[in-house]
Amino acid sequence: MDIQTEAKIMRIFISSTDKFKHAPLYQIIVYLAKRNGLAGATVFRGTMGYGPSSQHIYQPTFWEIVDKTPMVIEIVDDAAKIEAFFNILKPYLEIIRTGCLITCEKADVLFYKKGEKKKNFFSL
């Protein structure tokens, strides 16, 4: 990602129980982003939330753990790469039976640096 170009942030709102061919949808999205060369993706697990087709507001109580929680995947990259990735992602989302929301907005990237790869212990 070049910080001199216009950047965008894509947010994908799904549920932790959403699947694509028996795999968690959030994993599929992150692997697709990596495979397509996007700068990075982060998955956030929400504490509480609901969507347009929700019957309940999902939240854990003191004595239980709820399997179904809201998830947000954030991907930041150049505007052109984000738009191209949306076109790759859209067919996957049209196939699934569950709901989904995607937002996109301009992002001002203040700093972006790739980390150095760790040296293997045996290559010292």
Label each PLM-derived region with a short phrase:
Residues 1-124:
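Positively charged, small/polar-rich N-terminal and surface patches that mediate targeting and assembly
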